[in-house]
C-alpha cells in the first residue's frame, strides 16, 4: 500500500521508515499478521517424517519449549518466504464454497446485520450495535496511520469520539449518515489507488445497514493492502539481514532440539557415498582391476554439496523426510522437480519426432515452436493424480503425426509414410516409462546442464546446453536460474553447518 503515502503526506513516509528501522527486523516479524503465517504454512508441504532415526539421544521437552521452538521456526520461515519470493503478497482469505466455516460465517453475519436493521428501525432508533461498529471502524482507520499522521489521527479521534456519539444517541441528535460520510472520506484518503473505485461506490449507498456492510468489506481489502505495504517496507531490511537472521534462528532451534540436523546429515552422507562411488568407478582401470591407492578419488565440500542439491531434484517426497536445512524450500524444490520431469518428456517427444519424421523439419523454427507448445499444453497436468501419461502420449502421437504430415506437405517434401508414422507413435508412447532409454538420456543431459551451471558459479552467459536439448533450452534455463538461486541462498545461510558435517564425512571417506 505504498500508494497511500502519495495520497497523504509524502514527507511523513521518511519518519515512518525510520520508526520501522528502529523497531528492528525481529519486531517486524514478531508483529507479522496471522495471515502471513497461514500463507507460509500452506506453501510448505509436510516434511513426511516417517521412520525417523535418532542420531542424538531422545530427551523430554516441555510444552513451553515446543511452543518457543515453533515460534522461532515460524518467524524464520516468514522471513525466508518474504526474501525468496520476490512477489510475496497476502491475498484476502476466500472460504471454500459450501464449507462449514463459510456457512457459519454467513449465518452469524446475517444475524448481526438483521439485529442492526431492527434496532435502527425502532422508534426512537437504538444505536447500541451501530456505535460498536463505529468503534471498530475507528480502530481500523487508526491502524492504517503512520507515526507521522498526527493531523489525520486527531481528526479521526475527534469525529469518532464514542462517548460523544453515545450522548448524541441518547439525546436523539445522532446523525449516523454524517458519520458514515466522514468515514468514507477518510477511507478515500487512506486507501490505495486500486481501492478508489470501491470507496467511490460507497457514496452511492443510501441505506445505513447495506452501507456499513460495504464499508467493512472495503476495510478488509484495505487491511490486506496495508499488510502488503508493510512487507514491501521491511523487504530491503530483510534482504540485508536475512542470512544472519535465519542462521541465528536455526541455531536457537538447534540448541533446543539437538537432533535438528539428523536428516541433513543423512542427506550429505548419502551424497558423499554416491559421489565417491561414481568417481571410484571412473577411476577403475579399463580391465576392471582394483585401483591403486594413488588413484583414490578426492572429494571437495563444494562438489558434495552441489551433488546433494541435485539429489533434491529426484527426491521421493512421500517416503523420505526432507533435510531440515532445506525444509522451508521443499515446495520450491518439488515444483522444480516436477518441471524437470515434464521437460524431460517434452524434450524426448521432440527429439524422437525430429529424428524420425525428417531431419530437416526441425529447421523450420515456426513449426518447431508450434509443435513444442502443443505438446507442452497436453503435458500441463502431467503430475495431477487424474492425469494418465500413457493416454496423453497416445493423443500426442496422433496430433504430432498430423502436424508433421501437414508440415511436410507445405514444404513440398515426401509425404509421411504409414510405416514412419507407426514407428513415431510407438516411440512417443514408449516415453511413458521412466526407464525408456530416450527419456533417460534426456534426464541425464538435463542434470548434466544443471550440474555444469551450478559448478560455474552462475556466471553469464549460461553454459551451452547438451545436444538434443535445443528445443527446450529456454524452459531449461529458466528452471536452472531458479534452482541455482535457491541453492546459493541456502548455502549462504547454512554453510557453517554443512562445513562441520562434511569435514567429518570427508575425513572418514
From Swiss-Prot:
UniProt entry keywords in alphabetical sequence: Phosphoprotein
Compositional bias per record (Low complexity), positions renumbered to this chain: 16-30
Keyword Ligase: no
Coiled-coil parts of chain: none
An annotated GO cellular component: microtubule
Residue ranges crossing the lipid bilayer per the database entry: none
Biased composition (Basic and acidic residues): 1-12
Positions of modified residues (Phosphoserine): 56
Region (Disordered): 1-57
Keyword Cell division: no
Assigned protein family: Belongs to the TCP11 family.
Protein name per UniProt: T-complex protein 11-like protein 1
Amino acid at each position: 500500500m505504498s500508494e497511500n503515502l502519495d495520497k497523504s503526506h509524502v514527507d511523513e513516509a521518511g519518519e515512518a521508515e525510520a520508526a520501522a528501522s528502529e523497531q528492528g527486523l525481529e519486531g517486524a516479524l514478531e508483529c507479522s499478521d496471522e495471515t502471513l503465517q497461514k500463507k507460509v504454512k500452506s506453501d510448505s508441504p509436510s516434511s513426511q517424517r516417517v521412520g525417523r532415526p535418532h542420531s542424538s539421544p531422545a530427551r523430554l521437552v516441555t510444552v513451553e519449549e515446543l511452543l518457543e521452538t515453533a515460534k522461532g521456526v515460524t518467524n524464520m520461515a516468514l522471513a525466508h518466504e518474504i526474501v525468496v519470493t520476490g512477489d510475496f503478497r497476502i491475498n484476502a482469505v476466500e472460504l471454500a464454497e459450501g464449507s462449514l466455516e463459510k456457512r457459519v460465517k454467513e449465518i452469524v453475519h446475517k444475524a448481526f446485520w438483521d439485529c442492526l436493521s431492527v434496532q435502527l428501525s425502532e422508534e426512537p432508533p437504538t444505536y447500541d450495535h451501530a456505535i460498536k461498529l463505529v468503534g471498530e471502524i475507528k480502530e481500523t482507520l487508526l491502524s492504517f496511520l503512520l507515526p507521522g499522521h498526527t493531523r489525520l489521527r486527531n481528526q479521526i479521534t475527534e469525529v469518532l469520539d464514542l462517548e460523544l456519539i453515545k450522548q448524541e444517541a441518547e439525546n436523539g441528535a445522532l446523525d449516523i449518515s454524517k458519520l458514515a460520510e466522514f468515514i468514507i472520506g477518510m477511507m478515500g484518503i487512506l486507501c490505495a489507488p486500486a481501492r478508489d473505485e470501491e470507496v467511490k461506490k460507497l457514496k452511492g449507498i443510501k441505506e445505513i445497514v447495506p452501507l456499513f456492510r460495504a464499508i467493512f468489506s472495503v476495510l478488509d481489502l484495505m487491511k490486506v493492502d496495508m499488510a502488503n505495504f508493510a512487507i514491501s517496507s521491511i523487504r530491503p531490511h530483510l534482504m540485508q539481514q536475512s542470512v544472519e537472521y535465519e542462521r541465528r534462528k536455526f541455531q536457537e532451534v538447534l540448541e533446543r532440539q539437538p537432533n535438528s540436523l539428523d536428516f541433513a546429515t543423512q542427506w550429505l552422507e548419502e551424497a558423499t557415498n554416491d559421489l565417491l562411488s561414481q568417481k571410484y568407478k571412473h577411476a577403475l582401470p579399463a580391465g576392471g582391476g582394483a585401483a591403486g591407492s594413488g588413484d583414490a578419488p578426492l572429494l571437495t565440500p563444494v562438489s558434495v554439496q552441489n551433488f546433494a542439491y541435485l539429489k533434491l531434484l529426484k527426491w521421493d517426497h512421500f517416503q523420505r523426510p526432507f533435510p531440515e536445512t532445506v525444509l522451508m524450500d521443499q515446495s520450491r524444490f518439488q515444483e522444480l522437480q516436477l518441471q524437470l520431469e515434464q521437460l524431460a518428456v517434452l524434450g524426448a517427444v521432440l527429439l524422437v519426432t525430429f529424428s524420425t519424421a525428417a531431419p530437416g523439419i526441425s529447421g523450420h523454427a515456426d513449426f518447431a515452436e508450434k509443435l513444442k507448445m502443443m505438446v507442452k499444453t497436453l503435458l500441463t497436468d502431467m503430475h495431477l493424480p487424474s492425469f494418465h501419461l500413457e493416454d496423453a502420449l497416445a493423443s500426442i502421437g496422433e496430433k504430432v503425426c498430423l502436424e508433421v504430415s501437414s508440415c511436410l506437405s507445405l514444404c513440398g517434401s515426401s509425404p509421411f509414410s504409414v510405416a514412419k508414422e507407426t514407428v513415431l507413435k510407438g516411440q512417443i508412447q514408449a516415453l511413458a516409462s521412466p526407464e525408456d532409454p530416450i527419456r533417460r538420456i534426456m534426464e541425464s543431459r538435463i542434470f548434466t546442464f544443471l550440474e555444469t551451471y551450478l559448478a560455474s558459479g552462475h556466471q553469464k552467459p549460461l553454459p551451452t546446453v547438451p545436444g538434443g536439448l535445443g528445443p527446450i533450452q529456454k524452459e531449461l534455463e529458466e528452471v536452472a536460474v531458479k534452482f541455482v538461486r535457491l541453492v546459493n541462498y541456502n548455502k549462504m545461510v547454512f554453510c557453517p553447518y554443512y562445513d562441520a558435517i562434511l569435514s567429518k564425512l570427508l575425513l572418514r571417506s
